[in-house]
């Protein structure tokens, strides 16, 4: 997590595996490829936060709900960390609203095959499913596609600015996400029943 000031605004930049919650305004930003970010807020209390995560698993099912899968447990853990932090800062769960971003499918090369090639849509499907299951309204979303995104979540008015990034930079982000995904898969192989939060090495 990095803190910066840009044109007088306080910007908090989060990386994969991180989240941030604030009551004092400011902007939370992140760079997304296949990962997803959920922006959650309670407009009555003024509490807002964002996470950045990636589901990692060898196998994905088109029919089984993700919340029941090994990878889904990690996603649930990431979402609950954010929600619990929001509530500790004064948000009420029934007041939470969401916006979701990311989940791009970026192929580093056209010959790329395997589960990583669908991980973006898997992440997008998970975040929609989780929010629906928890009864948290999804007010807006920019999910999937073939380009990475930089997002800026303004926690003073809960607006989100989305900027699609160029193909070359999207490919760099895809390599980062693949490393994160492989690290997560290896962790599941070693401890298949554990749920861990991790950062790219």
Curated annotation (Swiss-Prot):
Keyword Secreted attached: no
CDD domains (alphabetical): CheD
GO molecular function annotation: protein-glutamine glutaminase activity
Top-level taxon of the source organism: Bacteria
Alphabetically ordered keywords of this record: Chemotaxis, Hydrolase
Reactions catalysed according to its record: L-glutaminyl-[protein] + H2O = L-glutamyl-[protein] + NH4(+)
EC number, as in UniProt: 3.5.1.44
A Pfam family: CheD
Entry keyword Hydrolase: yes
Gene Ontology biological process terms in this record: chemotaxis
Similarity comment: family membership: Belongs to the CheD family.
Role, per record: Probably deamidates glutamine residues to glutamate on methyl-accepting chemotaxis receptors (MCPs), playing an important role in chemotaxis.
UniProt protein name: Probable chemoreceptor glutamine deamidase CheD 1
Gene encoding the protein: cheD1
